[in-house]
Amino acid sequence: MSRFFHAKEDSDSDTSSSEDEVEDQKVNKSAKFRDDLDFMAGPEEDEKRVVRAQKDKKFDELKGIIKQNRDAKSNKDLNRLLTGFDSLAKAYDKSKTVFQRQNVANPRFYIRSLVEIEDYVNKLWDDKDAKSALSKNNAKALPPLRQKLKKYIKDQQLQDLVTDYRVNPDEDGYETPEDEDDDDFGEVSESKAEKSPGKPSEKAAVSDSDSDSDDDDSSNWSSEPESNSSDDEDSVTKMEQLRRYFLKKEFRVESKDDKKEKKKRVIRVKEAVEEDDDADWTPVNREKSVVHFDPKEEVTHDVMIKKLNEVMSARGKRTTDRNQHVANLRKLLEVSEEKELGLGINVKISFCIISALFELNAKISDHMEYETFMTTLQTVNSLLDLLIGTDRVKLSVTYAEEDENLKDDTQEYRIQGSILIAVQRLDGELAKILQNADCHSNDYIEKLKAEKDMCSLIEKAEKYVELRNDSGIFDKHEVCKVYMMRIEHAYYKYQDQNEEDAGKLMDYLCNKIYTLDDEKRLRQRAMLCHVYYLAVHDKWHRARDLLLMSHMQAIVDHSDVDTQILYNRTICQLGLCAFRHGFIREAHQGLSEIQNTQRAKELLAQAVGTRQHEKTAEQEKIDRSRQVPYHMHINVELMECVYLICSMLLEIPHMASCEFEMRRRMLSRSFHYQLKQSEKASLTGPPENTREHVVAASKAMLNGDWKKCQDYIVNDKMNQKVWNLFHNAETVKGMVVRRIQEESLRTYLLTYSTVYATVSLKKLADLFELSKKDVHSIISKMIIQEELSATLDEPTDCLIMHRVEPSRLQMLALNLSDKLQTLAENNEQILEPRTGRGGYQGPGSWFPGRNERQGDKQKGSGGYQGERRGGQGQDGKRGNWGSQGGQQRRHPQKPRAF
């Protein structure tokens, strides 16, 4: 075939292929148009369409942000929560106009969201552990979130709405009207979703028919016009659907019955889901191990002992329920009493119950619950009554388990154990309970009432010891512990009534320990408690002599910590006793040991030390366990005030007598520190606390104004804080006023001795409201002790001053001369190293190697050798300060005046 025919065939094929491409494009365009209209076609043409209001759209926007905020809270993502809160606030501000236009109040779900965020932030802010566990970004976002939330609620004036919501919060599962609308919309969408599965089949059918028609069109050229007409009809149909889709419909109005029916349907669905969930779970009840005896078997001693051993074998295991263990033992005791198995088994089971009650706490360092404590106390009390009522039962730690006799009633029952140790353990648990209670609450008072029952129990234990002491079932240490417990519950209490009987009882108990105790610790503690008791009851001389004879000052440093704490408490109480008796110097010496350390509360075991970084957690726990219960505390403020008053009465006359001495000895550094601090103040107001009252009184006494000093020490405020705390307040106040008068007189005479030539005793007596005899006695004592250079003239009743001491002007002149002399000596010391043998010899004198022979340098000759201030010279010896072989005259330096 020629090329011409080939070219024609090629052209025909090209034209046919191009025509096919055009047809395909037409078909694809029509199919694409149909697909674009399919998404707008509803599942059913007759179904009504709902048009949502703008209010509902705003509700949806707010609820979406609230849901995101809840997710952020659940994930503890505070950065995301902060961003979500800002978005929520902005969205709410935009929605305000819509709500106002449609007369819609603030949505309750929005207020609920603000309350939830506020509660979450406040809870996280108060929980220190949770705050410390936050990441760096979350910890940084927490303060601004809290601040923004408070400011937003305040600026938007939402406080009332938030308060109303907190008063009447929504219950779990409660839905607000806005939530109900949202649920209705959700149900409609769900119904559409349920009907939509039929749509793909229709589309599939349409697509199948389209594919068939396309195949027919491609195969039959004659049917092309028909296919085009069908495409036009489809397009018209789709346009009609589009017009109907965008046609606005009226709102669908639902009646109340419809809403109720929807609610019921939702509830039924929820119940069905819950039932399905519950069907997957099987409830498992914890079976309690109950003690059962075989009903066919007689409960004898052997059966009961076997069952008791079986129950006690579970003691201490991890899987053992401790409360159930106690219940099992009580059940055994009931059966034993019912079957009348004898006192031996009853006492054994009772003692096992007491041990089990003590073991209810997993850690021995934790305190026992108060209810458990009272239960244990009643159990121990009933067991003690049983032991006191019969002498056929012996309970002792000296018996072994093999030596026990629980069933043979012809002999004495022997049981291993010690009721005295149980009483001692119970006393320790009471101390722990009081240590861990809030001392400023009524709960502490309620728990403190148990001390009365505890004291009765200890007295009963003492009675039991005295009844059975001859049987040899007790150890000496146990007996001493019982007496010591009774002493420790009585030594700090002031007995206003029956003081003689209480004193005799204390002497009896302490003498028992002095006699029985072979160890030193209990004897030392009994001695200190005895001294404390005597000091509280104002028996100063007996308490002082007893403490000095015990030599506790020398051995207390080698004692245990609890004994050292008791020693500190005793010394403080002894100092207060000396103050009440008017022994100011002794009181000052006793209290200074504690007050000068600036750690009075820590030394008295009334607070934990502030330097906790130096201690481990275990040491801190031990220190807290040593704390004294609050009702046994010594008033530290009272003790400090007494110490400052004693310092004032001793230090102010001493300061007046040593006014012009450069290096006077201070009796109390803390008192001087308080005076200096008050002098540094630019503006001094009226005193407020006890310390400021004493400082103001000291300044008045230094000027000789005893009345002003008295007004600062004795007034209504000081009465409430200090003087009313003494049981003999009026006597103590009278003693303090008398000492203020006497020390003010001494200070006045020492301060103004250079001013007076003679002073009338009568005038001094009238000035300080003292008797002439007292004034004469005070002045005579001052003259004898060489504190005052004067003579008493009896015919004229005058005090004649001796001009031995320089006047104030002379003293100032002497001080000035001393300072000038010191200044001159300092200048001489600075200039002396620069002078040579013949005066100033020029700059060459500083370099002896230039003007002298090498041999002279080796011999050490020359005016200056080595360093200027007498350091090592070139020959290894000290350098000369003057000419060769000469000795410089040095004057001793006098003490400086400043």
UniProtKB/Swiss-Prot annotation:
Instruction: Tell me which species this is from.
Output: Caenorhabditis elegans
Name recorded for this polypeptide? Eukaryotic translation initiation factor 3 subunit C
HAMAP family per UniProt: eIF3c
- Renumbered to this chain, the Acidic residues biased-composition regions fall at 11-23, 170-187, 209-218
Subunit-structure text? Component of the eukaryotic translation initiation factor 3 (eIF-3) complex.
Region (Disordered) residue spans: 1-38, 162-238, 829-898
Q: Name one Pfam family in it.
A: PCI
Which part of the chain is the PCI domain?
630-806
Which GO molecular function terms does the record list?
Answer: RNA binding; translation initiation factor activity; translation initiation factor binding
Where composition is biased (Basic residues), the residues are 888-898
Family membership noted in the UniProt record: Belongs to the eIF-3 subunit C family.
Q: Which ranges are annotated Low complexity under compositional bias?
A: 219-228
Here the segments flagged for biased composition (Basic and acidic residues) are 1-10, 24-37, 189-202, 850-859, 866-878
Question: What does the function comment of this entry state?
Answer: Component of the eukaryotic translation initiation factor 3 (eIF-3) complex, which is involved in protein synthesis of a specialized repertoire of mRNAs and, together with other initiation factors, stimulates binding of mRNA and methionyl-tRNAi to the 40S ribosome. The eIF-3 complex specifically targets and initiates translation of a subset of mRNAs involved in cell proliferation.
**Has keyword Cytoplasm?**
yes
Q: Which controlled-vocabulary keywords does the entry list?
A: Cytoplasm, Initiation factor, Protein biosynthesis
Q: Name one GO cellular component term.
A: eukaryotic 43S preinitiation complex
InterPro entries linked: EIF3C, EIF3C_N_dom, PCI_dom, WH_DNA-bd_sf
Q: Where in the cell is it found?
A: Cytoplasm
Q: Any one Gene Ontology biological process term?
A: formation of cytoplasmic translation initiation complex
**Major place of residence:** cytoplasm
